[in-house]
């Protein structure tokens, strides 16, 4: 019969973050051999991660960090809001975003191999997945380095960690403008920075839709060109950051606000859990 104490079970749980019953079973299977029990739990955790691979990660958090002209925005996903609101999962997010800040990549696959306190981000994700009993994965990653980078995080629920985040690179430092623009992006979700960034096929599709809709509405043939141009312009005002009405002063466009501040947006990223 295996010989071990309650203290052994507790120590194994603290080391592996596995459940009490799992720790007890592992010690029994290992005949009280502590190191073997650790190995058994790690194997079990890896198997459980494999079983969770097909599950959907519709919850999670968005984390951000900035330092000396470098900023990162990271999406860490899990299955349920129960796990998302837990301190262990949120600590994982903090560790991953710090790794992202010191790793020169915007590729999530590369970040997974980055080392944090002697362990890879991949190992941290898998260990927490095993401990929390849910599929956890690293989602999107943005990393900007420039004259000025500003981040903004927003909680969609007071009980959950931030699930909406924005990262903005400006052409020059301007804390007030950076904060205002980041909050605007969070609220209005622009898809493009300028009109020139909208792909030609997207514009062509909008023109076709506008023309077809106008015809269905019975608009006069001679009026179609003007109607189509008006609706395409409306599309730009809705989806292009610089052409949107500014959140804090709708009488101005974002471009006018940037001009007044003497800066321009170089690029931006906006992540919201559950949205592409």
Curated annotation (Swiss-Prot):
Compartmental location: Cytoplasm
One term under GO cellular component: cytoplasm
Region annotation Involved in Mg(2+) ion dislocation from EF-Tu: where it falls in the sequence: 80-83
Coiled coil (UniProt feature): none
Keywords: Cytoplasm, Elongation factor, Protein biosynthesis
Major place of residence: cytoplasm
Pfam families named in the record: EF_TS (PF00889)
GO molecular function, one term: translation elongation factor activity
SUPFAM superfamilies named in the record: Elongation factor Ts (EF-Ts), dimerisation domain, UBA-like
Protein family per UniProt: Belongs to the EF-Ts family.
Function recorded in the entry: Associates with the EF-Tu.GDP complex and induces the exchange of GDP to GTP. It remains bound to the aminoacyl-tRNA.EF-Tu.GTP complex up to the GTP hydrolysis stage on the ribosome.
Record protein name field: Elongation factor Ts
Organism: Acidothermus cellulolyticus (strain ATCC 43068 / DSM 8971 / 11B)
